[in-house]
């Protein structure tokens, strides 16, 4: 069947915009962040099979290399009989499947960009579109990439296929390309003539209706949200690394043997000089490694290669080649052999880590780790790389000893007249003129059997003098920093700084008299009040810093009645905390917090602020728990820390603190038990599920009479009980219309429960009943409207409409779950991030209180009224309210 010319013109426009350009990389699949995740041709057993004819099983196994350099536009504008179609098989029969393969046509000279591979689904469908639908299908094809964009979810792609099957019924039985799935990146790929990426799995759907059936079965599954989007290559390859393609690499042992053999020769003749020069010029290969060619491609990774184009060995080789070419002409014949050996010695020394402390030796691991490149066809090569790196270090150390033995063994060269190097001896034509630059090395491509090695990380060479210098500088800078810090701390101690009202630092003669001698000792509340600024001598000066740090300016004088009211309020707060009376806390928290803030302003005492923050937080946490049934561990931890600080300040708690009460109520919450049982019942099937739901409703009705239920418990009980009864009513109803309405209502109740409880429960009985009722209704109403279609098409379209209904329900559930996720994320940020920060701030305030004199003040006032029936703790200073200078209760 030929493609309609109108549809062909639409594909021409799409390919011009969304196909891989001629200069693009056609051998790799990328994810939305442009990171490579898949490749083609890496493993032959996973390649997609191709077919150019019918169903010949032998031809199905052939792999055909299609040229990709053809111009897409000219190919599409050519005669219809010369279109560049290739026939693929969309089945998995080659890999053990049982479904019969059907050949389908795809582009032979074009591949879609990463992220737009879903367009391959429409290529074989284009051949089955009838002429009456050609214009509509062309518009559909041209608009689809702009509507979906790159990397749409599988759910979006399947919805598009469902829409296409509804508009163009003739494609319901059409074949579709193989869809591959990568378990590593969680991404799908619709294959083209490049086949299945290496190590990817295959989705078992060969036709449109099979694909739509898969969509129906996958409603609510996580993989429906995965994106739909490859030859191996190096990731993170940089432009600065392109020089490696022209660098000359040689096997380390081959170069070592060549140089060792060169040390045994006599160079009094030109033939020996020319032979060594030719051997050095032809040693190794270029084009050993590139972005798309692994180092060293196809070799044993244990083989070590030497880069002759990197310094310092390139410099030593250049000197040796220059001497062999023209440098020897100015020397006596008797000295040439000795001089050649000296140059060879220098080259050997650069190969030894014992002499040079730096090496140009690589294996696969060192190349990839040192240059931070990753071969995208492999995963988890870390342990292998470490082993190869260790092997490289051992190899270089062993060869360094061997090179040292060679140097000692060949101090007296042996004359061997018939010596020939192992490499080709043909020397290049060399001009007799004096060269003006380094001797050039001919470019020799790496043969097919000599493919490069693999990666290892060799530690960079160490300079012990540099390390010693860095250590000394670090010690000096650390000492200077410590001295400066100590000086700043001492200066800060001598400055006037904020203190609590019962501790002041004053200066001057009169201050000394008031403090009982000793300049600037701490003033206790029982002593003389500090002298006013008017009585200070002219020697006592105030600066802007003094004014800013004088906390007495913030103190407030209160009358006796107000102080008495505050004292009574404080005692009520202590009693409520001791008795863990949430009723009093909820009723009076606003008034108590206001009074505590006024106390803190009058007294300047940190425990008042801590207590106000604790009351405010514990009220919010308890209210939130009763309304939502949830409290985070971070919130409880912050309150436990505050309670410890308040205990240290003298606030007594009963046997159970408010935080422990909330924790115990959360652990014993009836709603949590009902939620757990409800989730367990959701996994049951058939009549057992209906009976279990009825039993759960009876249990809830029994426990609803309890008086200690929270608002959340009441809400959960009402919702779950109503749904359980609704399911029972549905099972007893026989009228299909009434039953469908009840199912819709019960489904809405189920979604509401998921939103309230934060669950993702789906009762199988409701889904099965709803599917059965919708199927019956569609079958009854659909046959009359499709009189011209075959029974198979009618059945397939009925299934498609059922999928639409399922997809709509899935979208509603997804929207509900998305709202739950957003609310949960906000609650998590509030409870797990902000609450710990507040807790740390509260602990910091407590620490500031004790560090600034709170303990000294309490030591001067050990007596404090205790709670009824509780004896005061001995041996520990007790916090007492209203001792500051501002309220003047120091009598």
From Swiss-Prot:
Record's catalysed reaction(s): Hydrolyzes a Gly-|-Gly bond at its own C-terminus, commonly in the sequence -Tyr-Xaa-Val-Gly-|-Gly, in the processing of the potyviral polyprotein
Region (Disordered): 502-540
Maturation and modification: The viral RNA2 of bymoviruses is expressed as a single polyprotein which undergoes post-translational proteolytic processing resulting in the production of at least two individual proteins. The HC-pro cleaves its C-terminus autocatalytically (Potential).
Keywords linked to the UniProt accession: Hydrolase, Protease, Thiol protease
Active site positions: 117 (for helper component proteinase activity), 189 (for helper component proteinase activity)
Enzyme Commission number(s): 3.4.22.45
InterPro entries in alphabetical order: HC-pro, HC_PRO_CPD_dom, HC_PRO_CPD_sf, TMV-like_coat, TMV-like_coat_sf
Top-rank taxon, per record: Viruses
Keyword Protease in record: yes
Family: Belongs to the bymoviruses polyprotein 2 family.
Protein name as annotated: Genome polyprotein 2
Organism: Barley mild mosaic virus (strain Na1)
Classification lineage: Viruses, Riboviria, Orthornavirae, Pisuviricota, Stelpaviricetes
């Amino acid at each position: 069947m030929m493609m309609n010319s109108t549809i062909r013109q639409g594909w021409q426009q799409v390919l011009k915009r969304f196909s891989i350009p001629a200069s693009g990389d056609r051998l790799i699949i990328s994810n939305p962040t442009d990171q490579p995740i898949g490749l083609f041709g890496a493993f032959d057993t996973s390649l997609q099979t191709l077919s150019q004819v019918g169903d010949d099983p032998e031809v199905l196994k052939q792999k055909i290399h299609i040229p990709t350099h053809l111009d897409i536009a000219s190919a599409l504008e050519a005669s219809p009989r010369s279109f560049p179609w290739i026939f693929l098989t969309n089945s998995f029969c080659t890999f053990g499947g049982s479904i019969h393969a059907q050949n389908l046509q795809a582009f032979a000279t074009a591949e879609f960009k990463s992220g737009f591979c879903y367009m391959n689904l429409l290529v074989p469908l284009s051949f089955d579109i009838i002429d009456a639908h050609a214009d509509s299908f062309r518009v559909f094809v041209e608009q689809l990439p702009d509507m979906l964009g790159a990397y749409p979810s599988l759910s979006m792609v399947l919805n598009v296929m469902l829409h296409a099957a509804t508009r163009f019924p003739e494609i319901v039985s059409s074949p579709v390309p193989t869809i591959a799935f990568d378990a590593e990146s969680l991404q799908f790929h619709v294959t083209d003539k490049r086949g299945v990426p290496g190590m990817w799995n295959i989705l078992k759907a060969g036709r449109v209706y099979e694909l739509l059936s898969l969509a129906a079965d996958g409603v609510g599954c996580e993989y429906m949200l995965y994106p739909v989007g490859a030859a191996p290559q190096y990731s993170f390859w940089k432009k600065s690394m392109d020089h490696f393609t022209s660098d000359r690499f040689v096997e380390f042992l081959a170069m070592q043997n060549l140089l060792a053999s060169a040390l045994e020769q006599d160079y009094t003749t030109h033939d020996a000089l020319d032979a060594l020069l030719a051997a050095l010029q032809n040693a190794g290969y270029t084009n050993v490694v590139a972005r798309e060619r692994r180092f060293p491609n196809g070799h044993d990774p244990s083989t070590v290669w030497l880069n002759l184009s990197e310094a310092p060995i390139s410099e030593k080789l250049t000197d040796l080649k220059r001497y062999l070419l023209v440098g020897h002409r100015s020397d006596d014949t008797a000295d040439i052999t000795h001089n050649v050996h000296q140059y060879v010695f220098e080259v050997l020394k650069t190969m030894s880590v014992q002499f040079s402390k730096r090496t140009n030796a690589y294996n696969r691991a060192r190349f990839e780790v040192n240059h931070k490149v990753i071969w995208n066809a492999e995963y988890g090569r870390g342990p292998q790389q470490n082993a190869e790196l260790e092997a490289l270090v051992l190899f270089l150390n062993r060869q360094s000893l061997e090179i040292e033995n060679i140097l000692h063994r060949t101090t007296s060269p042996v004359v061997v007249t018939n010596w020939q190097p192992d490499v080709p001896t043909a020397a290049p034509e060399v001009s007799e003129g004096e060269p003006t630059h380094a001797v050039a090395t001919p470019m020799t491509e790496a043969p097919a059997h000599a493919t490069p090695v693999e990666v290892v990380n060799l530690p960079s060479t160490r300079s012990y003098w540099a390390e010693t210098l860095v250590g000394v500088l670090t010690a000096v800078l650390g000492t200077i920093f410590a001295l400066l810090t100590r000086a700043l701390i001492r200066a800060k101690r001598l400055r006037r700084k904020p203190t609590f009202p019962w501790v002041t630092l004053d200066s001057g003669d009169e201050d000394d008299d008031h403090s009982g001698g000793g300049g600037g000792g701490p003033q206790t509340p029982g002593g003389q009040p500090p002298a006013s600024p008017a009585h200070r001598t002219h020697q006592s000066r105030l600066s802007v810093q003094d004014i800013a740090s004088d906390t007495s300016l913030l103190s407030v004088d209160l009358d006796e009645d107000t102080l008495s009211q505050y004292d009574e309020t404080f005692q009520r707060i202590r009693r409520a905390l001791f008795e863990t009376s949430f009723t009093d806390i909820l009723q009076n928290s606003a008034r108590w917090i206001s009074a505590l803030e006024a106390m803190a302003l009058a007294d300047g005492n940190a425990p008042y602020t801590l207590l106000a923050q604790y009351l405010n937080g514990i009220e919010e946490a308890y209210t939130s728990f009763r309304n939502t049934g949830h409290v985070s561990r971070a919130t409880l931890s912050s309150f436990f820390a505050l309670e410890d600080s308040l205990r240290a300040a003298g606030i007594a708690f009963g046997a159970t603190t408010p935080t422990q009460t909330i924790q115990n109520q959360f652990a014993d919450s009836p709603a949590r038990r009902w939620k757990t049982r409800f989730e367990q019942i959701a996994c049951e099937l058939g009549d057992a599920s209906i009976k279990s739901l009825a039993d759960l409703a009876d249990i809830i009705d029994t426990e609803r009479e309890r008086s200690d239920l929270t608002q959340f418990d009441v809400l959960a009980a009402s919702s779950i009980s109503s749904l359980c009864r609704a399911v029972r009513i549905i099972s007893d109803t026989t009228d299909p219309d009434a039953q469908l309405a009840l199912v819709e209502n019960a489904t809405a109740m189920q979604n509401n429960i998921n939103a309230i409880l934060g669950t993702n429960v789906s009762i199988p009985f409701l889904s099965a009943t709803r599917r059965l009722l919708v199927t019956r209704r569609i079958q009854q109403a659909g046959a009359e409207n499709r009189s011209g279609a075959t029974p198979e098409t009618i059945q397939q379209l009925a299934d498609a409409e059922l999928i639409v209904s399922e997809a709509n329900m899935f979208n509603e559930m997804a929207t509900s779950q998305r709202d739950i996720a957003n609310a949960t994320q906000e609650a998590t940020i509030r409870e797990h991030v902000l609450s710990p920060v507040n807790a740390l701030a509260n602990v910091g305030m407590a620490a500031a209180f004790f560090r600034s004199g709170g303990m000294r003040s309490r030591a001067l006032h050990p007596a404090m009224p205790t709670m009824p029936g509780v004896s005061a703790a001995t041996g520990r200073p007790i916090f007492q309210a209203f001792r500051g200078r501002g309220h003047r209760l120091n009598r």
